[in-house]
């Protein structure tokens, strides 16, 4: 099971590295569509900042899967929290019928919403973040 968790952490890390990099380049305009208009920050700043956070978390997931294993749970919890914090962007895209990333119908945008909870769960499970949260709850 430890091998499967490590492989999934590596895959999630690679996914975040790729997504974060695309925030800064090829898909920047697409990501702008997800920034809620009620957010009191410059949308371009939000896209760049979230991209840098994704790159950082992706790298840390990979590093903690391979070598700094004692920090895996902490990085997993932080990644899960990040996924929760960016969820309003996905909701914004759905509610306001915004086309981006090929999500050009409400059905596609709704299906995309369904992927966020499993991403949160994956971040917690593959990093042993759930175990860390259980330990913290006992304190």
Region locations from a protein language model:
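Membrane-interface extramembranous regions
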Residues: 1-139
């Amino acid at each position: 099971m430890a091998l499967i968790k490590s492989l999934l952490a590596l895959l999630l890390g690679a996914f975040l590295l790729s997504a974060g990099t695309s925030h800064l380049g090829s898909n920047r305009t697409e990501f702008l569509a997800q920034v809620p208009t009620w957010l009191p920050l410059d949308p371009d700043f939000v896209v760049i900042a979230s991209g840098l956070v994704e790159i950082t978390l992706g790298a840390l997931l990979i590093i903690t899967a391979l070598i700094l294993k004692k920090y895996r749970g902490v990085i997993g919890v932080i990644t899960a929290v990040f996924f929760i914090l960016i969820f309003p962007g996905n909701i914004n895209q759905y509610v306001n019928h915004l086309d981006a990333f090929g999500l050009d119908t409400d059905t596609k945008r709704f299906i995309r919403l369904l992927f966020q909870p499993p991403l949160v769960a994956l971040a917690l499970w593959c990093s042993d973040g759930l175990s860390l949260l259980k330990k913290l709850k006992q304190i």
